[in-house]
Amino acid sequence: MIAPSLSSGVEQLGDMIAHASSIVPFTGAGISTESGIPDFRSPGGLWSRNQPIPFDEFVARQDARDEAWRRRFAMEQTFAKARPARGHRALASLYKAGKVPAIITQNIDNLHQVSGFAEHDVVELHGNTTYARCIGCGKRHELDWVREWFFRTGHAPHCTACDEPVKTATVSFGQSMPSDAMRRATELAQHCDLFIAIGSSLVVWPAAGFPMLAKECGAKLVIINREPTEQDEIADLVIRHDIGETLGPFVGN
């Protein structure tokens, strides 16, 4: 059902939240645009100007690794200045109230943690851009160290433990999805009674399968997104309005 108006959608969503005992939010890029982080897939977004660097190219070529880190540091101020928007804060309020056991996100910006979610309760399907990992041994490297290395040498860094390449702790095209995050997201979708997909076009698989899984397992499904999605027809409620305006009334409540 598509909400006929914003107020109607908010009222229906509030009623569904009140009657739910285990709510699992699933967030995409749309929730962070209010924080100043662009949706990379949108027209004019980063990927319309620069093709993503596939994982196998990153592994094989020094110039690809250098370019990947150049792009990351070109976005430095965007990520550094970003603060949780109304959508993030509303979900954090529901989490603190005990309604939300954990959150599933496609985002890499760390804003759910900043908004108040414990790190272990944020299931990051596509990783996190605020630190780096060795692609060999998995050792974590902080961005301050990477930045110093990159601007001193002009090249992407190598791990201090095993000398393999270091990349942002994000999932690149062609890179395997994190198995622990996929397992946890599956469990959350299977056992919630309300699944809310927020700011996602629901076209990137396998992540887009979680709303369908939740619905198949008996949960109510809400989709909050300005544009239509292919899963609108199976949703119990579709709200095609601004995320901040839709979730804003739930901040602190």
Curated annotation (Swiss-Prot):
Recorded GO terms, molecular function?
histone deacetylase activity, NAD-dependent; NAD+ binding; zinc ion binding
Reactions performed catalytically: N(6)-acetyl-L-lysyl-[protein] + NAD(+) + H2O = 2''-O-acetyl-ADP-D-ribose + nicotinamide + L-lysyl-[protein]
Under the heading SUPFAM superfamilies, the entry gives: DHS-like NAD/FAD-binding domain
Provide the cofactor list for this protein: Zn(2+)
Question: What is any one of the record's Gene Ontology cellular component terms?
Answer: cytoplasm
Q: Which PROSITE patterns match?
A: SIRTUIN
Binding of Zn(2+) occurs at: 134, 137, 159, 162
Describe the function of this protein. NAD-dependent protein deacetylase which modulates the activities of several enzymes which are inactive in their acetylated form.
Protein name (Swiss-Prot/TrEMBL): NAD-dependent protein deacetylase
